[in-house]
Amino acid sequence: MKKCAEFTEKVETIFDYLFNEHDFVLVFTREETKRSGYCLLGLQNAVCRIVIYKTWSEGNLWIGPLNAAFDWALEGFYSGGALLMFILKQDFQLPDFKEFHSTEIQLQNLSDLLKPNVEELLDLFKE
């Protein structure tokens, strides 16, 4: 669980506004035992759930309703990046595979995109 503890600290720093301004709490943690370095975190507030995960090459964020189950399958969750592109009315860009970015940089890029648009994204899940 050491790897997940380190990842959790990074997520709490990179996405601090989710915890401090939008009342998200960490409610789920899973470290993949068969694949080194894989970690999945589940966040929740009164409106929705967010999964932030890392694999050996990817850091990503998915968002879903309160009834979506925290699991690697991500059933019931939607790509946070794709939803943000929809909100911003921009074409969804696939990552440039010529450049390798650390999971931390990938998550920081997502956070930079999410922060000014988080209210609109959360509105999609309000009843």
Q: Which residue stretches match the model-derived regions?
A:
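Intrinsically disordered, low-complexity regulatory regions enriched in serine/threonine/proline
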Residues: 1-17, 26-127
